[in-house]
Amino acid sequence: MTTIVSVRRHGKVVMAGDGQVSLGNTVMKGNAKKVRRLYHGQVLAGFAGATADAFTLFERFEGQLEKHQGHLVRAAVELAKDWRTDRSLSRLEAMLAVANKDASLIITGNGDVVEPEEGLIAMGSGGNFAQAAARALLMKTDLSALEVAQTALGIAGDICVFTNHHQTIEELDAAE
């Protein structure tokens, strides 16, 4: 699997992901890019789960963003509806984290669209470790969103065997 973490703080939103691709108990690749920019660089998106499935979802989500002129929540809800009802999509095994200047969302294969509390997303095999680390850092430090995301992902990489230390990080200015 993987670990994706997204943090909103001090007018910034950051999304970071590790680079490990595993097949069973074997590491197949260590530098995969699981976080990218969509819709003219205005949306950050990351995935956890099956890589081929995630690329299909990225493509569909980007289509929804275009269709709805970049409106993140509307595009996420429409993708979730398709994911729930389209037989070919319903078999996909992946989750998406998406964020723009206004919102951060998790889109699941069950058709859920969740806006997490405190603007913190952590998902994938190392998600619980990253979430615990990020929450502690957000509560007890004044670190930037970038520093919190990097540190949380690093801690997840120390603990989770399906997460490595190759980090892909994207950052946007967020709404205050």
Swiss-Prot record:
Residues that hold Na(+) according to the record: G157, C160, T163
Q: What is its main location?
A: cytoplasm
Reactions the enzyme catalyzes: ATP-dependent cleavage of peptide bonds with broad specificity
- Give the UniProt subcellular location, in the record's own words: Cytoplasm
Coiled-coil regions listed in the entry: none
KW Transmembrane (keyword) present:
no
Report activity regulation: Allosterically activated by HslU binding.
Domain of life (superkingdom):
Bacteria
Question: What are its E.C. numbers?
Answer: 3.4.25.2
Q: Does the keyword Aminoacyl-tRNA synthetase apply?
A: no
The alphabetical list of record keywords is:
Allosteric enzyme, Cytoplasm, Hydrolase, Metal-binding, Protease, Sodium, Threonine protease
- One GO CC annotation: HslUV protease complex
Q: List, from the UniProt record, the residues annotated as the active site of this protein.
A: T2
MF terms from GO for this chain are: metal ion binding; threonine-type endopeptidase activity
For biological process, the GO terms are: proteolysis involved in protein catabolic process
As for family, the record states: Belongs to the peptidase T1B family. HslV subfamily.
Spell out the subunit comment.
A double ring-shaped homohexamer of HslV is capped on each side by a ring-shaped HslU homohexamer. The assembly of the HslU/HslV complex is dependent on binding of ATP.
HAMAP family reported in the protein's UniProt record:
HslV (MF_00248)
* Function of the molecule: Protease subunit of a proteasome-like degradation complex believed to be a general protein degrading machinery.
Stated name of the protein: ATP-dependent protease subunit HslV
What gene does this protein come from?
Answer: hslV
